[in-house]
């Protein structure tokens, strides 16, 4: 089952509502903090990649599960950042697709 940005953002809104008053709010003033938390979670994923053999990342088990969980944390904060700055999934998708299109022709491979 796939997961899209609309669902992720709805889940983040529900999480924020559950902890309202305890967690910092989702607004532009706190966007910077969400980016920093996202980077901290990415750092945790990086530590797993640095310290564990790639074979353990590629096979079912606790290392792979822990790595995927850290990546999920990164995406949770990524969606918080999008919510802080009122970036809609459709807006992000359009920019992503445009950037991908530019990157597909940005560099020439040898012989092209």
Predicted segments with their positions:
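Flexible "arm" and connector segments at domain edges
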Residues: 1-112
């Amino acid at each position: 089952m796939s997961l899209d940005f609309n669902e992720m953002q709805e889940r983040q809104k529900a999480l924020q509502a559950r902890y309202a008053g305890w967690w910092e709010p989702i607004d532009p003033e706190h966007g910077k903090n969400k980016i920093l938390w996202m980077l901290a979670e990415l750092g945790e994923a990086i530590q797993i990649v640095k310290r564990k053999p790639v074979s353990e990342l590629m096979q079912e088990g606790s290392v792979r599960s822990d790595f995927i969980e850290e990546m999920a944390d990164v995406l949770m904060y990524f969606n918080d950042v999008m919510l802080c700055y009122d970036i809609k999934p459709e807006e992000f998708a359009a920019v992503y697709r445009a950037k991908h299109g530019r990157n597909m022709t940005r560099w020439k491979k040898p012989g092209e």
